[in-house]
Swiss-Prot record:
TM region(s), chain numbering: none
Binding positions (substrate): 9-11, 177, 216, 237-238
Pfam families, per the entry: TIM (PF00121)
Species lineage: Bacteria, Pseudomonadati, Pseudomonadota, Betaproteobacteria, Burkholderiales
This protein's GO CC annotations: cytosol
GO molecular function: triose-phosphate isomerase activity
Subunit structure: Homodimer.
EC number per UniProt: 5.3.1.1
Descriptive protein name: Triosephosphate isomerase
Annotated organism of origin: Polynucleobacter asymbioticus (strain DSM 18221 / CIP 109841 / QLW-P1DMWA-1) (Polynucleobacter necessarius subsp. asymbioticus)
Catalytic activity: D-glyceraldehyde 3-phosphate = dihydroxyacetone phosphate
Chief site of localization: cytoplasm
GO BP, one annotated term: glyceraldehyde-3-phosphate biosynthetic process
Localisation: Cytoplasm
Keywords: Cytoplasm, Gluconeogenesis, Glycolysis, Isomerase
Amino acid sequence: MRPLIVIGNWKMNGNLASNQDWVKTVARGMESGMPAGRKFAVCPSFPYLSQCSTLIKEHSLAFLSLGAQDVSAHGAGAYTGEVGASMLKEMGCEYVIVGHSERRQMHQEADESVAAKALQALDSGMTPVICVGETADERNSGRAEEIVCSQVAKQVSVLQDRLADCLIAYEPVWAIGTGKVASAQVAQDMHRAIRMQLAEFDEDVASHVGILYGGSVKPDNAVELFAMPDIDGGLVGGASLNPQDFLAICQA
């Protein structure tokens, strides 16, 4: 059985004081225990990884793992401004987001680069969260499944059986930061299409890979989304900045 996983992506938000308050609030909320068979992680900006790692340890947050929002496609060397996977692992990261739509759009990241980053994460013992998704124009033209499955197929071609150690996050680009959200059924249909694409490579891999939904997940839609058979949790953006909202989603 696949565990339900909720990962908070803070994006370029937070500061030393607010990060401390967030972890304290989440620690209090998790004191009474969390639903069995679930995993949770938070991905702050690079400068705050060390702080958040320390806070998680200080509060004995066994339920909460640390993740990063990106990683270099290179191991080490003359890559100014890049952060290597081994560095993130040393900071205590267990997850790393790769191929987020904002990175694809703003930094022209291609599927090949995303796969290279996923390999770096895997080689350092972290779980890559590989993001895929379609734009509004692609959905409106009836090409949503074609686009997303093509993105998945390109990851399969590089990662092969190592996909079993990855997560996939479906993030409809038109729903990110807009307040719009795919209905639970629309999201389920795409998650099912992704799983079927994986099954063309290996049915065992397809049945074991967690597929998260990542488009404006909030406390008021998380229950319905997470009830769908092929939705294995959420990659949560804006709502994860509010610790009470994050807790509510984790408990949905």
